[in-house]
Each structure stands twice: as structure tokens, then as C-alpha cells.
Design a protein with these regions (language model features):
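Charge-dense, helix-prone N-terminal extensions
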Residues: 1-135
Length: 135
């Protein structure tokens, strides 16, 4: 008799297991981000970005396959090491910021929602987040 260890599925495998489309689109992100207080979309040098005030908390690559997002710098390496096929270091010029990059094809909708909400929460005043999310 063989005892299997824990099964780890990536975003695509999880989505296939539950019968959903694994690829998150910019439209899904836009739909969520547009509901968040003080959040707005901006087009900067042909790239879609979402901001609160002047602070960017989400940004897409020009081809919309990658999404950068606000994330604590001190936790960044652990996140990337946990799923290196999904998460990437930002470009060298952005490494001084609280920022990580994710491949959209590797995300499911639940993960995308968590990332977007956490990134927004990092840049919005705490009371605004509490009022909106009830945390």
C-alpha cells in the first residue's frame, strides 16, 4: 500500500481540477479594482496602471501577460521562492519599491482577488480599507 504525500497544484492545475479557466485577464482585474474606494485606472506609456492618489498598486506589462503589484519588500523573496514559476522579481529599477511581478497565466481568480485587495490595502488609508472590507 502506498501513501501519497500532499498534492501541490499550480494555478492551471487547480483550475482544471475545478473546471474553471485558469488565466486571469486584465478585464477581471479591472472589474475588481474599479470597485475599490479611491482606486482609479491610468494609462502611462502604453501600460495600464491602477492607483490610489499618485501611488501605483497594480501595473501591467504592455502585452498584459504580467502584473506588478504592491507587496512588502521584506516578504518578497519568500513569495518568489515559494512559487518561482508564478512570481518574479521586479525589474532592477523597481526593486527598491514594495513590488513583485506575477504571470497572469498562472493565477486563478481567487488568487488574483487576494493579490489585488492586499496591494490596494497597502496604499489606501487604513480606515478606508476597514470601511470597505470590514477588517
Amino acid at each position: 500500500m502506498s501513501i501519497a504525500g500532499p498534492v501541490h497544484l499550480d494555478g492551471r492545475e487547480r483550475a482544471e481540477a475545478v473546471g474553471t479557466d485558469p488565466m486571469v485577464t486584465i478585464e477581471q482585474v479591472r472589474d475588481l479594482a474599479s470597485t475599490l474606494p479611491r482606486s482609479y485606472e491610468a494609462l502611462v506609456r502604453d501600460r495600464v496602471k491602477f492607483r490610489v492618489g499618485q501611488i501605483v498598486y497594480l501595473a501591467f506589462s504592455r502585452d498584459e501577460t504580467l502584473m506588478g503589484f504592491a507587496f512588502p519588500k521584506e516578504e518578497r523573496q519568500a513569495l518568489i521562492d515559494s512559487e518561482p514559476d508564478k512570481f518574479l522579481m521586479p525589474e532592477r529599477s523597481d526593486q527598491r519599491y514594495n513590488w513583485v511581478v506575477v504571470r497572469l497565466e498562472a493565477l486563478d481568480e481567487a488568487e488574483m482577488s487576494e493579490i489585488v485587495l492586499d496591494a490596494w490595502r497597502m496604499v489606501v488609508p487604513k480606515r478606508v480599507a476597514v470601511e470597505h472590507l470590514g477588517d
